[in-house]
């Protein structure tokens, strides 16, 4: 397959470019359907005139339906996208990129989607879709899925669909509130993901950023203890990775802690822990829920983070062995490997 692709790149470069463009159009329609032509044109940076011709071709091939409320994929369109995905990974060089990134960061596996979510917001949705597919491959008969907060994990929740195998799915927040907006908190995302998956959920009703005394007291509350035991029995953890300073500011972190994070050169954050460039913990938010030591016992851990601006944060987090599947985008992967 690789030899054929290399030959096509030399003999028929235009063919692969057309194929890539049409694949991206189908991919974007799948993520946002129903969508109007003007919105699609603006999102993909393709002129309406060119897009009109491409959409007409896809309609003639029975891959796209055009209705008054916008464009949607046909059943054939969905099937073709599914068949093409592995081929397009080879065409775009993502298969090799995944292998290189997996070895570079010592990952359980690497899944890379095309594009850069810093430049194209729809790429975050595609990461969400890839993360959902990854989760479903790893579900067993009975599952407890712990999820963190953040905009990227919210994208995973938004792309979640019911499990066709009707497996038992219980979703729980990995941690209590960490100071984010309500819509980005683990509780909110946990409930959203469970509803989209037709699963069930348990919530953790505790305030974020507790003092040591309050933390010690609240974890002894029977209702909190029960949910904590469920969280610590998780069979899967889905979490994001953020830039340390960005996350600290977003959470209205106290000035004293901000100084500590800055003085200790924190570059990355995950579920309330701040790490330096060597992957060492330099600050921890006192919040109820899953702790760093707990993740070693979790069979499946999926980290979802992308955008070229997060390359340094992703690399720092994986400086320590994590036994994790990373779902990221081309922008982050290429910058990370280019900077090595």
Curated annotation (Swiss-Prot):
Keyword Amino-acid biosynthesis attributed: no
DNA-binding residue intervals: 37-56
UniProt binding sites for beta-D-fructose 1,6-bisphosphate: 149-152, 175, 185, 250-251, 269, 310
Keyword entries, A-Z: DNA-binding, Repressor, Transcription, Transcription regulation
Molecular function GO terms recorded: carbohydrate binding; cis-regulatory region sequence-specific DNA binding
Purpose of the protein: In the absence of glucose, represses the transcription of the gapA operon, which encodes five key glycolytic enzymes. Binds specifically to the cggR-gapA promoter region and blocks the progression of the RNA polymerase, leading to the arrest of the transcription.
Protein name, entry field: Central glycolytic genes regulator
The organism's taxonomic lineage, starting at the top: Bacteria, Bacillati, Bacillota, Bacilli, Bacillales
């Amino acid at each position: 397959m690789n030899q054929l692709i290399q030959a096509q790149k030399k003999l028929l470069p235009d063919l692969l470019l057309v194929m890539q463009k049409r694949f991206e159009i189908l991919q974007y329609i799948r993520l946002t359907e129903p969508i109007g032509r003007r919105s699609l044109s603006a999102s993909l940076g393709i002129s309406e005139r060119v897009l009109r011709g491409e959409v007409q071709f896809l309609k003639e091939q029975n891959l796209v339906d055009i209705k008054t409320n916008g464009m949607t994929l046909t059943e054939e369109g969905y099937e073709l996208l599914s068949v093409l995905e592995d081929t397009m990974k080879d065409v775009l060089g993502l298969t090799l990129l995944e292998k290189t990134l997996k070895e570079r960061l010592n990952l359980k596996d690497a899944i890379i989607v095309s594009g850069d979510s810093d430049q194209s917001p729809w790429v975050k949705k595609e990461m969400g879709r890839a993360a959902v597919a990854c989760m479903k491959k790893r579900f067993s008969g009975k599952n407890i899925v712990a999820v963190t907060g953040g905009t990227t994990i919210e994208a995973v929740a938004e792309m979640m669909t019911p499990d066709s195998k009707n497996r038992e799915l219980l979703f729980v927040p990995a941690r209590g509130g960490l100071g984010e907006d309500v819509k980005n908190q683990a509780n909110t995302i946990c409930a959203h993901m469970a509803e989209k998956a037709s699963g069930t959920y348990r919530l953790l009703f505790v305030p974020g950023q507790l003092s040591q005394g309050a933390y010690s007291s609240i974890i002894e509350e029977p209702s909190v203890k029960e949910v904590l035991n469920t969280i610590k029995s998780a069979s899967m953890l889905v979490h994001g990775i953020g830039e340390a300073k960005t996350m600290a500011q977003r959470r209205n972190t106290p000035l004293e802690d901000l100084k500590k994070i800055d003085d200790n050169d924190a570059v990355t954050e995950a579920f309330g822990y701040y790490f330096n460039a060597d992957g060492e913990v330099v600050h921890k938010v006192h919040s109820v829920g899953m702790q760093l030591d707990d993740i070693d016992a979790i069979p499946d851990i999926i980290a979802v983070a992308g955008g070229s601006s997060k390359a340094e944060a992703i690399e720092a987090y994986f400086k320590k062995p994590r036994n994790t599947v990373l779902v990221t985008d081309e922008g982050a992967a290429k910058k990370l490997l280019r900077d090595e």
